[in-house]
């Protein structure tokens, strides 16, 4: 095949010049080809691929060993060995006390929780008396464990605080471990108590059948009540402290101390009460106000600051008694006693 090129034609338009086609070698050298680029990129890609595979397979065993070691450290804890010098030192976590076998494949939640509990027990067992020489058998139960034996197990053997088990750095237990080791406080609900006898500790609001306590300190004693049928029985939990300016609750209503106050014969000197006592009912709540002369009625007693009325146990203050005594000086001095029936 012959191609004609206008460059080889003579200017005068005479003869035609035939030029031969260029060879394959000339086309190979002159024209750039994609084959050369592919041949250069393929070795580079293969080299990078083999290098990546080499690094991956080289680092894979290290990653697996590190992961296995981290799992193993979660279920184990450092052991403490105490020598004859009395100083505690940490041992490798793989050395356990005889009779304790932990399988490496057991990585459940129970093993992890046991490890955390034992580590927390070792942390809490630190005693401040590190300078005092103590034997190993004195801090463990029974004293049968030798002094150079390791003090660690999944369930700690030492029930008392261990002065010899001292960790090197503090460790904060997770929240769920602290919640599990927290002592349980049993709270008795009010509805669990029987309705026939309910123990209720409350502030002493003055019952209708006893005089109110005038406590100088402003603290009312606590009274324990036991409800039986329709009668409410009162008993003091503690003794009421003695106060000079105040008064005292009487333990027994029939026992009434002496008074040096003036009791008047007419009913106008006493304050009207609220009526019969609601605690004893209308039929049984009758109080007798017996007036009797007493030789020692003029004695200065600490109960002279109050006086009982006819029905209700309300009392009159000392200033009220003195004011009534000024108006009624002609009346005789009497001592009052009250009996409940």
From Swiss-Prot:
Topological domains on the Extracellular side lie at 1-36
Enumerate the UniProt keywords alphabetically. Cell membrane, Developmental protein, Membrane, Transmembrane, Transmembrane helix
Give the residue ranges of motif VPPNSP motif: 206-211
Q: Where does the sequence pass through the membrane?
A: 37-57
Provide the phenotype resulting from gene inactivation: Morpholino knockdown of the protein results in embryos lacking the body axis and dorsal tissues. Reduced dorsal marker expression but enhanced ventral marker expression.
Q: Which GO terms describe its biological process?
A: dorsal/ventral pattern formation; embryonic axis specification; positive regulation of canonical Wnt signaling pathway
Instruction: State what this protein does.
Output: Key maternal determinant of the dorsal organizer and body axis formation in vertebrates that acts by promoting stabilization of beta-catenin (ctnnb1). Localizes on the plasma membrane of the future dorsal blastomeres in early blastulas and binds to and promotes the tankyrase-mediated degradation of axin (axin1 and axin2). Axin degradation results in stabilization and nuclear translocation of beta-catenin (ctnnb1) for activating organizer-specific target gene expression.
Q: What is this protein called?
A: Protein huluwa
Q: Which organism is it from?
A: Xenopus laevis (African clawed frog)
* Gene label: hwa
């Amino acid at each position: 095949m012959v191609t004609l090129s206008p460059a080889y034609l003579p200017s005068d338009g005479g003869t035609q010049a035939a030029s031969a086609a260029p060879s394959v070698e000339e086309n190979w050298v002159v024209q750039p080809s994609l084959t050369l680029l592919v041949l250069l990129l393929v070795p580079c890609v293969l080299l990078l691929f083999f290098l990546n595979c080499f690094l991956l397979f080289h680092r894979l065993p290290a990653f697996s060993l590190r992961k296995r070691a981290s799992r193993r450290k979660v279920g184990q804890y450092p052991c403490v060995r105490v020598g004859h010098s009395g100083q505690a030192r940490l041992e490798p976590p793989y050395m356990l006390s005889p009779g304790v076998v932990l399988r490496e494949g057991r990585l459940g939640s129970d093993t992890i929780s046991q490890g955390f509990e034992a580590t927390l027990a070792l942390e809490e067992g630190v005693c401040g008396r590190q300078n005092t020489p103590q034997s190993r058998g004195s801090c463990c139960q029974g004293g049968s464990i030798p002094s150079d034996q390791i003090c660690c197990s999944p369930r700690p053997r030492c029930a008392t605080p261990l002065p010899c088990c001292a960790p090197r750095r503090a460790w904060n237990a997770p929240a769920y471990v602290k919640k599990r080791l927290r002592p349980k406080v049993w709270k008795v609900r009010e509805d669990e108590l029987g309705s026939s006898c309910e123990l209720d500790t409350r502030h002493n609001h003055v019952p209708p059948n006893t005089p109110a306590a005038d406590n100088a300190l402003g603290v009312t004693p606590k009274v324990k009540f036991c409800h039986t049928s329709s009668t409410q029985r009162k008993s003091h939990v503690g003794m009421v402290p003695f106060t000079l300016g105040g008064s005292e609750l009487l333990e027994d209503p029939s026992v009434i101390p002496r008074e040096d106050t003036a009791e008047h014969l007419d009913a106008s000197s006493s304050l009207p009460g609220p009526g019969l006592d609601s605690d004893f009912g209308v039929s049984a709540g009758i109080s007798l106000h017996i007036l009797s002369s007493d030789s020692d009625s003029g004695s200065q007693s600490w109960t002279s600051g109050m006086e009982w009325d006819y029905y209700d146990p309300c009392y009159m203050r000392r200033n009220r008694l003195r004011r009534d005594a000024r108006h009624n000086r002609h009346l005789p001095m009497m001592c009052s006693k009250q009996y409940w029936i």
